[in-house]
């Protein structure tokens, strides 16, 4: 009886647990994006950034996303802030192409848009005035 109950609990836990896909995107500039930052699809949180590393002169951003959400293959990954000075998140702007195969556990975004900060903008304005 005890083993049956244990098996049922184990089965329920493993079937309820969301399935996860890994993603990778490359950027030139990721200021403010951190490990643990949200990954959003059209503004809805669907995952987290798990690693940032420099790879061949670019910053490779990797993370986990819930595969319950269908992501078109031509989606664009960008880095955005919540408000003017808010924390950064990776935003997936959905495209219109076929969806990534949900059985494929690795998604690579071909097109990305870099993050630009207020600090960069102020430096740009300072250079114009000089």
Where are these regions (language model features)?
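Extracytoplasmic/periplasmic terminal helices and flexible tails
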Residues: 1-28, 34, 60-62, 66-68, ...
């Amino acid at each position: 009886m005890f083993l049956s109950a244990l098996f049922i609990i184990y089965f329920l836990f493993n079937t309820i647990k969301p399935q996860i896909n890994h993603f990778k995107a490359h950027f030139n500039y990721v200021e403010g994006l951190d490990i643990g930052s949200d990954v959003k699809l059209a503004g809805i949180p669907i995952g987290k950034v798990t690693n940032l590393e420099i790879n061949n002169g670019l910053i490779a951003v990797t993370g986990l996303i819930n595969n319950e959400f269908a992501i078109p293959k031509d989606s664009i990954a960008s880095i955005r802030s919540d408000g003017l000075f808010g924390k950064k998140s990776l935003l997936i702007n959905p495209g219109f192409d076929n969806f990534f195969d949900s059985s494929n556990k690795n998604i690579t975004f071909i097109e990305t848009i870099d993050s630009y900060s207020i600090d960069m903008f102020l430096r740009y304005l300072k250079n114009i005035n000089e």
